[in-house]
Amino acid sequence: MDVYGLIGNPVEHSVSPPMHEAAYEALGLDARYVTFEPASEQLDTALEGASALGVRGLNVTIPFKEDVLDVVEPDPLAERIGAVNTIDFEGEPTGHNTDAAGVIRAFQHHDVERSGTAVVVGAGGAGRAAAFALADEGMEVHIANRTVSRATALATEVPDATGHGLDELAELVPDADVLVNATSVGMEADETPVPKRHLHEGLAVLDAVYAPLETRLLREADAAGATTIDGAWMLLFQGVEAFEIWTGKAAPVEPMNEALRSSL
């Protein structure tokens, strides 16, 4: 039996186990997905133990996404983003960041072209992944953040990117082709990071928030004629990418999606 899993603290509310277990069942794989919850100071020991026990791969969640960079060799994209969310133990353990693929594959699934101008709201982990992913697709990326210095600092790392404060969204969003909310704003029903007057037809909006699935931003974007993509799609496709890295097989997207959404 092949063993995969999730390492983080806490992990009890993660939806990754049912999503990956659904993939194994759909493909008839003899595999299990388990969770590991070490204390912060035990990360090195936990990863060494997982490798010694023959664990094939791990997803990584808070608070370890950055700490893992000191333990396993990251691939070039994970190194640029500055975070690892997937470890492949085949051969020399390698760290990957599949959040970037989660963004791109979510847009691909909804037939959204990644060309023109993108606005990314948020300069944290999800914002970094989205900014690098869209820049690598050839898009001009504008990063807006409550703390402007974080946006401008990230923009110096991302090709063809600029950093802005949230007050500049009024100028940025009306001309954008793609908008990504990479903040937690929207978890409260009446909050949105972008006023509805800036949303427009022809815009594609991805909201990384997945609880609730239908955020105020997505409702107002839909009313404005924009293409809307909820956060579960990004969550799904980062998991799909991890599955494919570990197994070398095409992931069964629909069973994984059904299991994920049933768990939210």
Swiss-Prot record:
It catalyses: shikimate + NADP(+) = 3-dehydroshikimate + NADPH + H(+). One of its GO terms (biological process) is chorismate biosynthetic process. Pathway: Metabolic intermediate biosynthesis; chorismate biosynthesis; chorismate from D-erythrose 4-phosphate and phosphoenolpyruvate: step 4/7. The keyword Amino-acid biosynthesis applies. Shikimate binds at S14, V15, S16, T61, N85, D99, Y210. It comes from the Archaea. This is Shikimate dehydrogenase (NADP(+)). The gene is aroE.
